[in-house]
Amino acid sequence: MSAGKYLLGTAALVGGVYYYDQYVQPILPRQQHQELAYQTQRVENKGSELNNKLTKKIEEGKKFVNEKTESVTKQVKNSDVYQKLQLNTEDYKKHVEDAVDNDKNVFVVGIQKYIDFVNQLGEVKVQTGTTQYSTVSPNVEVKEKSIFGNWFDKSDNKVDQLKNDADKKINEAKDKAESTKSDFFNWNSKKADELDKKANEAINWTNKQIDYASAEWHKHYEQAKGDWNKALDDLSKQWNDSKKQLNGRFDTEKDRAIKGVEDAKSNFEKLSNDLANDASKNQKLKDAQDHFGKSLENLKLFGDDVYNDFAKRFDDLFNRK
């Protein structure tokens, strides 16, 4: 077939397609470009919306964990257990300091009393009706009023008895002082043991309260972390479902566009053969060919592989000799 005949046939075919499309049955795609652009924009908007939701959900999750952590910390500090722990710790410190000071004071006062008591024993004087005896010196000085000489022997016996009584009192006083000192140190030792026991009890109680507070905080933290992970899982599932929905919509629109082009191609070939000898239809066929070219350009929205495949087919159709 010569080039002139081919052009004539092509023009007739295009004119026939146009006539058939306008007056018999619509076969050419309409508003394809606008529809594909609209669907593409919807896909982009949907992706942007999901991305914004994901970012917002992550920020809300971070804020939720921070608020939960601050709330748990505040609850622990405001709890009766924590307040009693602080109060008992301060009271215990003050009690120990006061006890140490009191023990020091008691010890010092006791020693001073003991020293004063011993000093008082340094000199003991016994006054009788006629004689004053001193225990300072072992040589007892006797000053008698001389009345009757036969009283001297009796006075010597009294001196010895008084001296013995004084020595006995001194020894008893010393024994009592030693006993008092021993009792004091024993008491002080018991007091120290009692303070150590109270200190250990306070430390054990404090450790228990700290362990309890730590366990409570850990429990609330784990709960907040679990809620956060669940929120992320739910968001990820929602994103995957939306992505599948968008992909399915995209594939559907692509298949619809491909089918429309294939149907138009089939109708164009059929009309080209039917109108090959009708010269008045050449311009209409040319217009139909241009329209096919535009619809073919729309296939670029679905990838170069789809476009190249159909472009080759139409090149073969419009360039056949």
Curated annotation (Swiss-Prot):
Keywords: Cell wall, Secreted. Gene3D superfamilies: Apolipoprotein. It is found in: Secreted, Cell wall. It comes from the Eukaryota. Its main location: secreted. One of its GO terms (cellular component) is extracellular region. This is 37 kDa cell surface protein.
